[in-house]
Amino acid sequence: MRILHMNAGAEDGGGKTHIISLLDQFPTGEVELAVFEDGIVAKEARELGIKVHVFSQKSRYDLSILKNISEFINNEKFDIVHTHGPRANFYVSLMKKRITAKWVTTIHSDPFEDFTKQGLKGWIFTKLNLKALKNIDLFFVVTNRLKKSLAALGISNEKMHVIYNGIEYDKEKAEGYNKKEMFNIDEDVFTAIQVARLHPVKGHEVLFDALQRTKLEKIKVLLVGDGPLKENLKSLATEKGINNKVEFLGHRQDVKQLFASSHVNLLTSHSEGFPLVLLEAANQRVPSIVTRAGEIEPLIVDETYGWIVPTDDGRALALALEEAYDKWKTGELAAMGKHIYEHAIMNFSLQKLYEDTKETYKQLIAKNL
């Protein structure tokens, strides 16, 4: 079995974690990685000993690499090309008739929402991505809800396989920081964290609305992540008068320690699949407040595991923050963190993700799918 995973290469956050952690489970020689940018994905893959091929472009619109990629796939006799992300999907759709390998993709988020709030460019990219999806041999989808989006494109149920995300869990939680020394945050300040790209789909403006509404005075939200909205969000924080409640940390490599330093995790997205960041928070025994933007219910089964609030509802988010604060004061919040950790470790493991993925590969190669 020879599998080539393909990604633009600039992926960060949950998408990158999914790709790298999954590839790392396979025996050496079974999987390789192709990227179009020699960025963070390639770097982390190399560090794990994964073979990486970089097909550099002059720009994302440079299609001259397609001939080289298709010849590479055929010459190396890959059985399957597994794409992640719209750019990889679009490029393989243009090569589909020239390659002998089967084509698989993972749908991490709603393809109708991937380029939301990006104007004409976003509309064009959405159309191209949706058209590309119609030529794929097999889909891994990370939630049942995403199957409905694909069904709207005419994708048959037989081509879709739901495999939930998973991670490796730590027996002990990470050592949290002395927040006074690191961030000048006093011990009596309720500390929340949001690990997300500064991108329109992640809904930071909803969080800022909640922080403006909340009665809580001693609260600080650590904002981990970079993206195109960085300066806009800093201006919005100033406009709403919440600069004292947020800390922009940018891209960080110490996310485990940051989770361990926080009391509750936040995710305020407009659209999600099954977010890995919720599992990463659970791994550090931190419960989450999350918008109903994806299929969250398998993880946050009821109110003893965390909070699911309506999307685009700053008032509901503010109320959830206040409830979490009250539970922090009584010690209930820490108990919720242990509860969701125990649930996650039993149901959303990296080993299960790997085994289900590999078995599906075998069936596809054997033409049973």
Describe the function of each predicted region.
Residues 134-159, 167-171:
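A short, active-site helix/loop in glycosyltransferases that binds the activated sugar's phosphate group
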Residues 13-21, 190-213, 228-235, 276, ...:
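A conserved mid-protein helix/loop that constitutes part of the nucleotide-sugar donor-binding site
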Residues 83-89, 107:
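Short His-centered aromatic/hydrophobic patch
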Residues 63-67, 102, 112-132:
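Nucleotide-sugar donor phosphate/pyrophosphate-binding loop at the beta->alpha transition
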Residues 251, 270:
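Aromatic "clamp/platform" in nucleotide-sugar-dependent glycosyltransferases that forms part
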Residues 302-303, 307-315, 324-329:
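Conserved acidic donor-binding segment of nucleotide-sugar-dependent glycosyltransferases
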Residues 34, 287-290, 300:
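Short hydrophobic beta-strand element within catalytic cores of glycosyltransferases
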Residues 172-185, 330, 337:
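A short helix/loop element that forms part of the nucleotide-sugar donor recognition site in Leloir-type
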